[in-house]
Amino acid sequence: MTGGASGIGAEVARRLRAAGRTVVTWDVQDTADISCDVTDPTAVEAANARTIAEHGVPTHWTLSAGVGCGGMLLDLEADAWDRVMDVNAKGLWLTMRAAARAMSQAGTGGSIVAVTSVSARLADRTMGFYCASKAAADMLVRVAAQEWAPLGVRVNAVAPGVTRTPLLGDPASTPWVAGPVSRTPLGREGTPEDIAEAVLAVHELGWVTGEVLTADGGLSLHSPIDPLGYRRPRP
């Protein structure tokens, strides 16, 4: 599991361990089981080799490593683009590839679930680079699902909406986050527990691949021509 030291990844790991599963977390944080920078091909291969040597080939991979990037397109610089695309797109591809190669060589098949974002399809002028990186992630999932289906490897994603994690901070004290939360039909931000439930459910869907499950409390249901949305008074 990438990004398993905090946030959504940590909650998925906690739930799996509570159920008696063996979990190996990869992260740049010290609390991870294996230190791994997902943007570094050598580090990914080393983490994969160590995981297999110590625990065998995993059959369920949760890829939740990610970084944020705010700012207007006219103001951002190339290094910000490189950073967010390196982690959210390149890092996802490197870890997906490592997972698929391991399961293919072992002949086990299995499930890969990436944690992406509703930002892949909801344009936000203050988060252009992030939106682009998550759109790339969603398409990587779909292409990988098509390519690796003959190997018995399913590839899906869960796309959270506004979720309370260390990456996001406290929505109540962050104006650009509080706005989307106020427009969420279910009336609150998501929690790592909410997204962990979705991730674990998708792993168990044996005849589903190439899908992106939206877990956003209904945020993406809004129509641009219906600004009141769910708050419209009933007749």
Describe every region a protein language model picked out.
Residues L74, L122-G128, P150, G187:
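Active-site loop immediately N-terminal to the catalytic Tyr-X3-Lys motif
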